[in-house]
Regions:
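Short, well-ordered alpha-helices that flank and scaffold nucleotide-derived cofactor binding pockets
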Residues: 49, 84, 88, 109, ...
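Generic beta-strand hydrophobic packing signal
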Residues: 31, 61-64, 183
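Generic structural marker for isolated residues within well-ordered, non-membrane alpha-helices
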Residues: 47, 83, 104
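DPxDG-like acidic metal-binding loop motif
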Residues: 63-94
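A short glycine/serine-rich beta->alpha loop
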Residues: 29-35, 68-72
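Phosphate/pyrophosphate-binding loops at sites that engage ATP/ADP/AMP, CoA/4′-phosphopantetheine
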Residues: 47-63, 149
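Oxyanion-binding and handling regions
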Residues: 1-26, 34-42, 95-199
Length: 199
């Protein structure tokens, strides 16, 4: 298997694209833009810039890893559709991972237990709890007061999924990837309009 991986995440305000060499999880290049409203506009330029920074082209890629949330509808669709398009066009596998896992797995070996919390908007948070980098609870969406330790976690500086975390979150690159399924964890903000009642 070609060991050059494109890692993408658009589940948070960060628009992440990175090129990772699977051997040793070596990040060759990574581009991150923080803009919750510009995932579609920034993802492809970030991917192309990361490839250029690494001195590679899309033809050098052996697989794609994409964060599947939890996150907002539009943000997730941008990342997942882009990952699927690269996979289809290049004939390479696309592995979906929980975006919170990409953050939690980076804590392995540094702290025994960590709570990963991201903004779910509408005064709610997405969260999952990890022990030694392995998810032990979640992912879920709740009000911060309903998540033990969330207030403390929210007081810390923001951390977003990284290219290395996304790649580390894939359990087995030799296995057939599961279908990409977004982790919305709640109903969309937009609702179908009810027909007008006439009398």
């Amino acid at each position: 298997m070609n060991t050059i991986i494109l890692a993408i995440d658009t589940a948070t305000p960060a628009v992440t694209a990175g090129i990772v060499k699977l051997d040793g999880i070596e990040v060759l290049a990574e581009r991150v833009s923080i803009d919750a409203r510009a995932h579609a506009e920034q993802l492809t330029p970030n991917v192309l810039a990361a490839l250029a920074d690494a001195g590679l082209t899309v033809g050098d890629l052996g697989a794609v890893v994409v964060g599947c949330g939890p996150g907002p509808f539009t943000g997730l669709r941008v990342g997942m559709a882009t990952a699927a398009a690269y996979g289809h066009a290049l004939g390479i596998p696309v592995h979906g991972v929980c975006s919170l896992d990409a953050i939690g797995i980076e804590s392995a070996g540094t702290v025994s237990e960590v709570l990963v919390v991201t903004d779910a908007r509408r005064r709610e948070v997405y969260w999952a709890r990890y022990r030694d980098g392995v998810r032990i609870d979640g992912p879920s969406v709740n009000s911060p007061v309903d998540v033990p330790g969330a207030a403390e976690a929210l007081a810390r500086p923001a951390v977003y999924p990284t290219a290395s975390g996304l790649v580390r979150a894939v359990a087995d690159f030799s296995a057939e990837p599961a279908p990409l399924i977004p982790l919305y964890l709640r109903r969309p903000d937009a609702k179908p309009q009810q027909p007008a009642v006439t009398r």
